[in-house]
Curated annotation (Swiss-Prot):
Cellular compartments annotated: Cytoplasm
Residues with Phosphoserine modification: S63, S73
Domain called Phosducin: residue spans: 54-214
The protein, known as: Phosducin-like protein 2
Pfam families reported in the protein's UniProt record: Phosducin
Role of this protein: Modulates the activation of caspases during apoptosis.
Protein encoded by which gene: PhLP2
Lineage: Eukaryota, Metazoa, Ecdysozoa, Arthropoda, Hexapoda
Keywords for this protein: Apoptosis, Cytoplasm, Phosphoprotein
Single GO cellular component term: endoplasmic reticulum
Top-rank taxon: Eukaryota
Length: 240
């Protein structure tokens, strides 16, 4: 019996007369199916089992050169699709990771650099004054974090150039912006733990605001007990 899906003039006539139905469409391959075909191809080449966790680690961590080495005539199309997807992902990551350092800005730069930073951009602004040790400490920590989180824009400015007559007692100050809107602020030594603040603690604080994708989930800052409660407990212990 002739295949009704075969491309022949006779079948075209039968379809035109309504005697046979339209040619069945080829099933579209899904991304999951592409992933499965690719995993099967790689497994045949490496002879290593790929479970769900291993697949994510082994495939997604491959460089473009490693993907090139896996290509052969049978699997070239599948691997090429994945290769193009990886290129797109790398380009997207590179586009986001465009900062990587602490930039010095002036009051004139404030609007363009902070409030008009762009869609999806987090900005961490450090207001400082020269000669203030705590400001130097914050700057040191921010330099480390800027390298680790290049998708976040870290800037600093002499406080009085952005806000005239800004009180030095309120330094250092950190403002956190997202898409031009102020999301969080830390004003003065007390809120920033003075000279006890560590880079890990600052990372956690910025992460809580959403400014950096930190993996720190527990607050590393020491828990300070309420002084009044502690005094009451000390006094009550005198009776025993």
């Amino acid at each position: 019996m002739q295949d009704p899906n075969e491309d022949t003039e006779w079948n075209d006539v039968l379809r035109a007369k309504g005697i046979i139905g339209p040619k069945a469409k080829e099933a579209e391959i899904t991304e999951d199916q592409i992933q499965k075909l690719m995993d099967d191809a790689i497994q045949r080449r490496t002879d290593l089992p790929l479970n769900e966790g291993q697949r994510d680690k082994k495939i997604d961590d491959m460089s473009l050169d490693e993907l090139d080495e896996l290509e052969d005539s049978e699997d070239e199309a599948v691997l090429e699709q994945y290769r193009q997807r990886r290129i797109a992902e790398m380009r997207a990551t590179a586009e986001k990771a465009r900062f990587g350092s602490v930039r010095e800005i002036s009051g004139q730069d404030y609007v363009n650099e902070v409030t008009k930073a762009g869609e999806g951009i987090w900005v961490v602004l450090h207001l400082y004054a020269n000669g203030v040790p705590l400001c130097a400490l914050i700057h040191h920590h921010m330099q480390q974090l800027a390298v680790r989180f290049p998708q976040t824009k870290f800037v600093r400015s002499v406080a009085t150039t952005c806000i005239p007559n800004f009180p030095e007692k309120n330094l250092p100050t950190i403002f956190i912006y997202h898409e031009g809107a102020l999301r969080k602020q830390y004003i003065g030594p007390l809120e920033l733990r003075g000279d006890k603040l560590t880079a890990e603690e600052l990372e956690f604080m910025l992460g809580q605001a959403g400014a950096v994708p930190t993996e720190i989930t527990e607050d590393p800052r020491p828990q300070i007990r309420d002084k009044m409660l502690a005094d009451l407990e000390d006094k009550s212990s005198d009776f025993y």
